[in-house]
Amino acid sequence: GRQMARLPVDVKLARMLVAANTHSVLHELLIISSFMGIQDPRERPAEAKEAADNAHRQFTDNASEFMAIINLWRGYRQAHEECSQSQLRKWCEKNYLSYLRLREWRELHRQLLITSQELQWPLPAWQDVEQRLVLGLTESKSAQLHYALIHRALLAGLPTQIGHKNDKGQYEAPRKR
C-alpha cells in the first residue's frame, strides 16, 4: 500500500507495477502503465481511418494489444533518439500519432521510472529488456514465460476486466456479470 501510494498513477496501474516488480517485468509495465495513464496517442481521424490503421499496423502484435503498446514505445523511442524535434513531429504526423500525447507518455514514464528507483525496485538495463522483447518474438519456453509474466502483472490491476466466453458465445465477467 505504501509503495502504491508513492506512484503517481491510478491505484489499478500502481497495483500492476507492484506485481511487475514481483514478476521481474517492471521495465515493460512501466511502458504499459504509463500508456494507460494518458489518452491514447494513436490518432484516427474520420477522413483518414484507413491510412491511420495502416500506419498503426507497424506496431501491432498479433497476440496482445499490450505488446503492441511496447512496440509503439520502441518505435517512438527510436524516432525520439534519431530525429530533431521538427523531424519527430513529422514522424508523428506521418504515423498518425499525437506528438503532445507521446511527450506526456514519455514524461509519465520518466516519473514512474524515478519513483521505482526511489523505491529501490531493480530494473534491468534497457539492452537486456530489448533482448527479452526480441526473444519474445520467438516461441521459446522462456519467451512464453516472459510474455505470461507481463500479462500476469497486468491482471493484478485489472481483475474486473477479465472475461470468459461461455458456451453461448457470450462473455461473462467475474461474478457472472
Describe the residue ranges of each PLM region.
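Second RecA-like catalytic domain
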Residues: 1-176
